[in-house]
UniProtKB/Swiss-Prot annotation:
Top EC class, one word: isomerase
Disulfide bonds: none
Cited Pfam families: Asp_Glu_race (PF01177)
UniProt name for this protein: Glutamate racemase
Lineage start: Bacteria, Pseudomonadati, Pseudomonadota, Gammaproteobacteria, Enterobacterales
Catalytic center residues: 92, 204
Biological processes annotated in GO: cell wall organization; peptidoglycan biosynthetic process; regulation of cell shape
Gene designation: murI
Length: 285
């Protein structure tokens, strides 16, 4: 069956009829949330999935908290008006740290956020040195420092904030090669340490997409830790115990905020993840 790009006003002709399934939204500013979606889909393959990414305001790491909250609420509202949701996953560390209270106040379905996996990293480290690799926004936010104080106060935490790594992950999904030299430059503060982190928290959902390249650059034996599997387990529990009965028989669909040539180039990638169509989402505000 042909797969179509759609403008938001065209019926979804590519949808394949099936039994109604709970509808779950996975949202990110870019394509990094696909790493979280992949973990959820692995655990829960028989759901109706919607992936939405904000390619108009990407990246969120450099935006104000007020902007992010308003933007995320507007996008989730627009999706909810098209497809009643059983659950939403904000698969963006930056957006999660600031927008979850507003989302949970507005909507009656569960909203799951993504936070840096500080707690498991603190348990895994052997040398007591944990690296946090995230966006500059996540590194600076008080929420991150509260996590460290609560779960890793006996560890030495080395933080690196990088917007460039987000761009590298996006480029990789567009089929471009990842420069190991660029990664070495970004990670130079750790690579120069006499005793570098033996456990690294991937504190941005884009970064698991670069796992292969990171392992080539970081010292041998470095552990990489992210939140994807934990988010999948939390999603499964909430769907069983707290989610409303919001189902759809439609095929999985992806939404962008602007149908740019770059967004269109992502369609083959989205298809590999199980999304038949890519459509522009009309967002108010």
């Amino acid at each position: 069956m042909a797969t179509k790009l759609q403008d938001g006003n065209t019926p979804c002709l590519a949808a394949t009829p099936s039994e109604p399934r709970p509808t779950v939204l996975v949202f990110d500013s870019g394509v990094g949330g696909l790493s979280v979606y992949d973990e959820i889909r692995h655990l829960l393959p028989d759901l109706h999935y919607i992936y939405a990414f904000d390619n108009v305001a990407f990246p969120y790491g450099e935006k104000s908290e007020e902007f992010i909250v308003e933007r995320v609420v507007a996008i989730v509202t627009a999706v909810q008006e098209r497809y009643p949701l059983a659950l939403a996953v904000v698969a963006c560390n930056t957006a999660s740290t600031v927008s979850l209270p507003a989302l949970r106040e507005k909507f009656d379905f569960p909203v799951v956020g993504v936070v840096p996996a500080i707690k498991p990293a603190a348990r895994l480290t052997a040398n007591g040195i944990v690296g946090l690799l995230a966006t500059r926004g996540t590194v600076k936010r008080s929420y991150t420092h509260e996590l460290i104080a609560r779960f890793a106060n006996e560890c030495q935490i080395e933080m690196l904030g990088s917007a460039e790594m987000v761009e590298l992950a996006e480029a990789k999904l567009h089929g471009e090669d990842v420069s190991l030299d660029a990664l070495k430059r970004i990670l130079r503060p750790w690579l120069r340490m006499k005793e570098p982190p033996d456990t690294v928290v991937l504190g941005c959902t884009h970064f698991p997409l670069l796992q292969e390249e990171l392992l080539q650059v970081l010292p041998e034996g470095t552990r990489l830790v992210d939140s994807g599997a934990a988010i999948a387990r939390r999603t499964a529990w909430l769907l069983e115990h707290e989610a409303p009965d919001a189902k759809s028989a439609d095929a999985n669909i992806a939404f962008c905020m602007a149908m740019t040539p770059e967004a269109e180039q992502l369609l083959p990638v989205l298809q590999r993840y199980g999304f038949e169509t890519l459509e522009k989402l009309a967002v108010l505000g």
